[in-house]
């Protein structure tokens, strides 16, 4: 199959030699199907193996503060604009956050994310509670602490960095062109600014999106190119698992091949960036969950998600072993 006059394997070779795939080439790849799609997966797997070998990384999260979010994101169970019946509670205490870190580390994960609902964390007592938990996690030395606390001020970012935070997670969720269809309570540039600020203070940045919201494949490419421009360190890929009570509750489910197609595109656009498959994995990929690595992913989130149960870590570990892959053991710094 010829892609903009370049065979897929030749395109992969040029990427491995340091070339960047163009917007036109990426858009052409969105039209692939059938055997050509299998060739795309093979190319993406080749690029993944070049940069990450046979190692894959695991991460886990804790819903550290749930519900009552003032944002109106159309997919979110925790938005106060939607009647979802989600559990609502304030920031968990340090002992609970530390216990969560130990549990996630025990399953071989390299990163543990403390996730709070809301537009952004309140400076003062709430931020200091998170920083205290980060210091305690770093002191045990078993897993790298991450946080997803909404938009950041420079003061908060510097305080988190000083406490020992390794990774800051803040998704753009979708492309700039589609974002107004998903959220009206803040601007896309607010999210971009938080990503830039986190990088500015020296944090590793985890930033990706959620697919199946009604966006086009071209808009998925648009997001990937934005992430490349922002030079993020890790890209989490989520697939919509609709929540009753949200505006997107009746969205049509993605096909497994559509999900894998998206993963492969992201690998070729972001060849040396960690790509982690997170929410919606079981519902959308079903029997093809193990194919995420063959399509170019270099990691998965294991355990529970924010408001839904995830797959048992033991099942994920067995899947990785069956593929002849190994868990990356080195802790992020």
Curated annotation (Swiss-Prot):
EC number in record: 2.8.1.6
Family, as annotated: Belongs to the radical SAM superfamily. Biotin synthase family.
Protein name according to UniProt: Biotin synthase
Disulfide linkage: none
Cofactor comment: Binds 1 [4Fe-4S] cluster. The cluster is coordinated with 3 cysteines and an exchangeable S-adenosyl-L-methionine.
Stated role: Catalyzes the conversion of dethiobiotin (DTB) to biotin by the insertion of a sulfur atom into dethiobiotin via a radical-based mechanism.
The Radical SAM core domain, residue ranges: 51-281
Source taxon at top rank: Bacteria
Record GO biological process: biotin biosynthetic process
The keyword Flavoprotein is assigned to this record: no
Catalyses which reaction(s): (4R,5S)-dethiobiotin + (sulfur carrier)-SH + 2 reduced [2Fe-2S]-[ferredoxin] + 2 S-adenosyl-L-methionine = (sulfur carrier)-H + biotin + 2 5'-deoxyadenosine + 2 L-methionine + 2 oxidized [2Fe-2S]-[ferredoxin]
Assembly behavior: Homodimer.
Entry cofactors: [4Fe-4S] cluster; [2Fe-2S] cluster
Signal peptide start and end residues: none
InterPro entries membership: Aldolase_TIM, BATS_dom, Biotin_synth/BioAB, Biotin_synthase, Elp3/MiaA/NifB-like_rSAM, rSAM
Name of the top EC class for this enzyme: transferase
């Amino acid at each position: 199959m010829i892609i903009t006059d370049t065979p897929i394997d030749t395109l992969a070779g040029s990427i491995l030699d340091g070339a960047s795939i163009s917007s036109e080439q990426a858009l052409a790849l969105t039209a692939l199907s059938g055997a050509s799609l299998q060739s795309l997966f093979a190319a993406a797997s080749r690029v993944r193996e070049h940069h990450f070998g046979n190692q894959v990384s695991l991460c886990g999260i804790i819903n550290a503060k749930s519900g009552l979010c003032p944002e109106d994101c159309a997919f979110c169970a925790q938005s106060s604009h939607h009647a979802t019946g989600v559990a609502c509670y304030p920031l968990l205490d340090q002992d609970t956050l530390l216990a969560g870190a130990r549990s996630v580390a025990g399953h071989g994960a390299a990163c543990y994310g403390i996730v709070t609902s809301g537009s952004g964390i309140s400076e003062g007592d709430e931020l200091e509670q998170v920083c205290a938990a980060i210091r305690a996690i770093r002191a045990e030395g078993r897993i790298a602490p991450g946080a997803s606390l909404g938009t950041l001020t420079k003061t908060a970012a510097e305080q988190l960095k000083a406490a020992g935070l390794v990774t800051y997670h803040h998704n753009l969720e979708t492309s700039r062109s589609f974002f107004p269809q998903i959220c009206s309570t803040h601007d896309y540039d607010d999210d971009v600014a938080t990503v830039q600020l986190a990088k500015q203070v020296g944090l590793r940045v985890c930033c990706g999106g959620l697919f199946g919201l009604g966006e086009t494949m071209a808009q998925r490419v648009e997001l990937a190119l934005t992430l490349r421009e922002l030079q993020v360190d890790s890209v989490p890929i989520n697939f919509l698992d609709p929540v009753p009570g949200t505006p997107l509750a009746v969205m049509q489910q993605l096909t497994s091949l559509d999900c894998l197609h998206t993963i492969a595109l992201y690998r070729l656009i972001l060849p040396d960036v960690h790509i982690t498959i997170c929410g919606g994995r079981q519902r959308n990929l079903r029997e093809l969950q193990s194919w995420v690595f063959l399509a170019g992913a270099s990691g998965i989130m294991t355990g529970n998600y924010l408001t839904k149960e995830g797959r048992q870590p033991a099942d994920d570990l067995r899947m990785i072993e069956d593929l002849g892959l190994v868990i990356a053991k080195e802790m992020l710094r």
